[in-house]
Amino acid sequence: MLVCYSVLACEILWDLPCSIMGSPLGHFTWDKYLKETCSVPAPVHCFKQSYTPPSNEFKISMKLEAQDPRNTTSTCIATVVGLTGARLRLRLDGSDNKNDFWRLVDSAEIQPIGNCEKNGGMLQPPLGFRLNASSWPMFLLKTLNGAEMAPIRIFHKEPPSPSHNFFKMGMKLEAVDRKNPHFICPATIGEVRGSEVLVTFDGWRGAFDYWCRFDSRDIFPVGWCSLTGDNLQPPGTKVVIPKNPYPASDVNTEKPSIHSSTKTVLEHQPGQRGRKPGKKRGRTPKTLISHPISAPSKTAEPLKFPKKRGPKPGSKRKPRTLLNPPPASPTTSTPEPDTSTVPQDAATIPSSAMQAPTVCIYLNKNGSTGPHLDKKKVQQLPDHFGPARASVVLQQAVQACIDCAYHQKTVFSFLKQGHGGEVISAVFDREQHTLNLPAVNSITYVLRFLEKLCHNLRSDNLFGNQPFTQTHLSLTAIEYSHSHDRYLPGETFVLGNSLARSLEPHSDSMDSASNPTNLVSTSQRHRPLLSSCGLPPSTASAVRRLCSRGVLKGSNERRDMESFWKLNRSPGSDRYLESRDASRLSGRDPSSWTVEDVMQFVREADPQLGPHADLFRKHEIDGKALLLLRSDMMMKYMGLKLGPALKLSYHIDRLKQGKF
């Protein structure tokens, strides 16, 4: 039985359920880590953070006002380009992606549009504005014209600062890695100096440690990421656990004094986003110093100059200016994350991750677990994994199989070393072994990977897309057929567990903001669409990838498209409409079209749409997917502009009516 960790009698820490803090999976959890290291989490009142984490209702592309992190006296226009947990990734309009930065949704440094003018200020161009400064007013006008402004209601008041510095050496917390600010990692208070604290990252050498004020917004209580949905990175892979000779309940809460030895090695617990080798430049594992942590001695390395060479004959000697050596330890906090040192797009979550498919799989605890898995351990697993990114859910599912195995080595042998994916671990032969899963590029790969693993485990009925009952069928190979599994980027998808139920979308995974009228929890509204398109249920894999975004809209959209078509029909398109009888596509069921057939249809529908035909090959859109496309999908996923998207929607509607 897992027990949530509580260390202070009078101070209630984050009220985390055991299913969050402690998990039978092999990934990192604070509950187990605190017990094994005999550590004390910093109480919530030490931080300048809300006791209840604020909700994040921002959306990508929303505009707001933000302080320029490189020139804090300037207020600029910023665009939300990324979201994670309670944080926003912002980009100043007129700047490039090398200077993106992160802010909490309750930061005082972000305000709704109009706040600066209301207070008598003026919006300024960002430092490094790429255009001529004289063009700023016109640039500002064009930027705000028609843009989506973040509403005032989704901004939150910044929490008050603690009355003074309550931190003590050895306390555990979660902290932003300022050299890679999209990472939040487990950390320890290494030293306290007045109003400042030294943040040291567990399991990594001191190159990434930094000083900050006790009221910095870059440090969080233990459990913050679990509550906000942010990704907490695991500590380094070779951390030595300090053992406390006294029970955890005997720890002095006023002055933590935890004695330790360095004999026991912590088995690495990969997090839901395992740190990938080489991801952080120059970061190598370090040995965790026994508590209380003494201040690390950071001696300045001597500057190295190129080898001295004699001057050339006739040349003049120029005096060489020596650089000032860096201070041994900074005495002031770093006000902002140093994103200028991060390579382009390295300080942000990759665009592929922003639009990554969302997956949720359920665990069948009542079915046969096969000869390799312990049924009692399977019963202790959570009922489902996700909804989360496909790579995260894949890692959780695979790690669960390893953790529940009678012999972890057997399950581990079924896996091959990949590159760029999440990390899983197993313990056998008195050693810990880690392995990178392959990078997950599509939902299709996730499905085939789990199918193959379950087949090797002889437990083919282990995972599904709905809570399991006695009538649920297993994941079958036919559902993973490569010819049917083509997916658009950024879609929401739930693993299918039977052909009969594959049309049912997962209500948690749907975008209620973008499709408020199209949300359904059963497949009844999808079946008329299937019959009108001529799609039998047995070919529903193409439907699954789009039905979670809603069914085709009503007649108003069709009337709008027909009006648009009459006004914008291109010259020569009528000739194509009349001569299409000779096309090799005529008489064939559109649902049987290949990608090449779809490209031919686009070219024949309108000559002006010809340049866009290659997009259908790029996104692997066959006949089944074509029949489900809407104008908003083509604009969002394929990058088409409104005009071509409406024209294509018009032709697709005619195709459904049998007028092609």
UniProtKB/Swiss-Prot annotation:
Disulfide linkage: none
Tissues expressed in: Strongly expressed in heart, muscle and pancreas. Weakly expressed in brain, placenta, lung, liver and kidney.
UniProt entry tagged with the keyword Repressor: yes
Keyword Nucleus attributed: yes
MBT repeats (start-end): 28-126, 134-235
Alphabetized GO MF terms: chromatin binding; histone binding
Gene Ontology cellular-component annotations: nucleoplasm; nucleus
One GO-annotated biological process of the protein: heterochromatin formation
SMART domains membership: MBT, SAM
UniProt cross-references to Gene3D superfamilies, sorted A to Z: 2.30.30.140, SLED domain, Transcription Factor, Ets-1
Keyword annotations of the record: Developmental protein, Nucleus, Repeat, Repressor, Transcription, Transcription regulation
Comp. bias regions, Low complexity: 330-343
Pfam families in UniProt: MBT (PF02820), RBR (PF17208), SAM_1 (PF00536), SLED (PF12140)
Basic residues bias spans: 273-284, 305-320
Subcellular location: Nucleus
Residue span of region Disordered: 233-345
SAM domain ranges (all copies): 593-658
Record-annotated membrane-spanning stretches: none
Function: Associates with Polycomb group (PcG) multiprotein complexes; the complex class is required to maintain the transcriptionally repressive state of some genes.
Record note on quaternary structure: Interacts with the SAM domain of PHC1 via its SAM domain in vitro. Associates with a PRC1-like complex.
Homology family: Belongs to the SCM family.
Protein name per its UniProtKB record: Polycomb protein SCMH1
Organism per entry: Homo sapiens (Human)
Lineage of source species: Eukaryota, Metazoa, Chordata, Craniata, Vertebrata
